Every structure is written in structure tokens, then in C-alpha cells.
Amino acid sequence: MSLQKKPDLKDPVLRAKLAKGMGHNYYGEPAWPNDLLYTFPVCILGTIGCLVGLAVLEPTMFGEPANPFATPLEILPEWYFFPVFQILRVIPNKLLGVVLMAGVPAGLLTVPFIESINKFQNPFRRPVAMTVFLIGTVVAVWLGIGATLPIDTSLTLGFF
């Protein structure tokens, strides 16, 4: 059962805002039927039209046919798998690599519980979440760049 807080209509600040027009129908036109029947279909059909037009005008170019007998020396995954690929490539024990990969979402799931005492929405007033985000971004970029390099320079990125 949810508890809904009702506005205090005796509050002078709220009464002043309501007198100026804030509240119901604040923007001057109702959402139904104007937005739901006219604006949204135009946006959705326009997006679909742009995608179909781009697909027709610029079809995907296929490269050379695959030759299973001549594989490249090092096969790289798609760019969004580079950090995971680097973890599996660098850690000698594959089970430890899989545990580290599972630890990333597990660690992200713990952040709201660690910072549950902080009720601010501003990210600069939530130091734990901001630190986890910044460190995670730096580590993911570092691992992603390292995955594109040879294995001997991948950890140091050639700096050391």
C-alpha cells in the first residue's frame, strides 16, 4: 500500500505558484489528445522513416568472404567487449577472470546500499557513487585501450 503525500493548499508559496498558473495544464495544452495522437506518431514514424531511408541509401558493405583456413593472428572482439577481453587475456587463471567479470555488476549493485544514508540527487554530493563511477570509467577505458595492444605492452599501455 503506497502512501501519497498531498500538497498543503494553505502554503502561501504554493498558492502563489498556483495563482500564476502552475499546476494542472501548466504548459497550456493537454497531453491527450494533442501529444499522444499527433506528436508521438509523427516522431515515431519520422524516426522509422529516417532509419529505412538510411538503410536503403547506404546498405551495409560486406567485406571479403571469410576464409576458415586463413585466420588472423589475433582476433579482437567488438569494441564494447574490449575491457572484458583484456581481463580474460591478462589474468592467467580463467576462473579468476570470470569471477572478476561477475564482480563488476555485483560491486555496482552494492553502491546504492553503501550510500543509502545520503539522500541527495546531485552527483557531486554523493562521493561514494561519484568515486565508483570515475574509477570504473578510468579502469574500463584503460582495459579497453590495452586490449587493442599486443599482450606485452597491454598492461602498461607502453608508458613504462
From Swiss-Prot:
One of its GO terms (cellular component) is chloroplast thylakoid membrane. The chain crosses the membrane at residues 36-56, 95-115, 131-151. It is found in: Plastid, Chloroplast thylakoid membrane. GO terms for biological process: photosynthetic electron transport chain. The keyword Protein biosynthesis does not apply. One of its GO terms (molecular function) is oxidoreductase activity. PANTHER family: CYTOCHROME B. The 4 large subunits of the cytochrome b6-f complex are cytochrome b6, subunit IV (17 kDa polypeptide, petD), cytochrome f and the Rieske protein, while the 4 small subunits are petG, petL, petM and petN. The complex functions as a dimer. HAMAP family: Cytb6_f_subIV (MF_01344). This is Cytochrome b6-f complex subunit 4. It comes from Mesostigma viride (Green alga). The gene is petD.
